[in-house]
């Protein structure tokens, strides 16, 4: 079932196959969200002040990459909706090739690259995914590889 686009309510490791693809709903990023996140977690001028940000290399306000990562996580979790939750084992190759700006609509595309039973936790399996976050113009704003521990059906 390579390239199958799945929509299900609750997923277990047993439901997942290499090549399965998932796409999230859209998420609108607002100026208020960008500034509030930056004030708490990444207080750089191009995340905090519209006027000052216009004088930077970005020529305007942009979201922190970490804010983009947090939005990606939210959309990923909502879309895959793992039964009992999934435990993140790590992220590799995290990239932010284009900035996220106020008003952008983000969507996450996830593809399962590998699946295998866990050797140490027999009631779980390990999946490897590629997550790509795009804006409304189809521009890639974040990519990453992720691994997660997912429960099997009992």
For the regions a protein language model found, what residue spans apply to each?
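Hot-dog-fold acyl-thioester-processing enzymes
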Residues: 2-90, 153
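Conserved interaction-surface patches within small, structured recognition/assembly domains
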Residues: 92-94
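HotDog/MaoC-like acyl-thioester-processing domains
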Residues: 3-18, 96, 100-154
């Amino acid at each position: 079932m390579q390239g199958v686009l799945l929509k299900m309510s609750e997923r277990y490791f047993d439901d997942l196959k290499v090549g399965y693809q998932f796409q999230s709903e859209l998420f609108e990023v607002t100026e208020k969200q960008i500034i509030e996140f930056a004030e708490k977690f990444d207080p750089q001028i191009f995340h905090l002040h519209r006027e000052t940000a216009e004088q930077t290399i970005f020529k305007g306000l942009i979201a922190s990459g970490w804010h983009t990562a947090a939005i990606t996580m939210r959309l990923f979790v909502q879309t895959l909706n793992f039964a009992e939750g999934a435990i993140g084992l790590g992220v590799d190759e995290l990239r932010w090739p284009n900035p996220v700006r106020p008003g952008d609509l983000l969507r996450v595309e996830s593809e399962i690259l590998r699946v295998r039973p866990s050797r140490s936790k027999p009631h779980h399996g390990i999946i490897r995914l590629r997550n790509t976050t795009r804006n409304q113009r189809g521009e890639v704003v974040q990519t990453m590889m992720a691994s997660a521990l997912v429960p099997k059906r009992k």
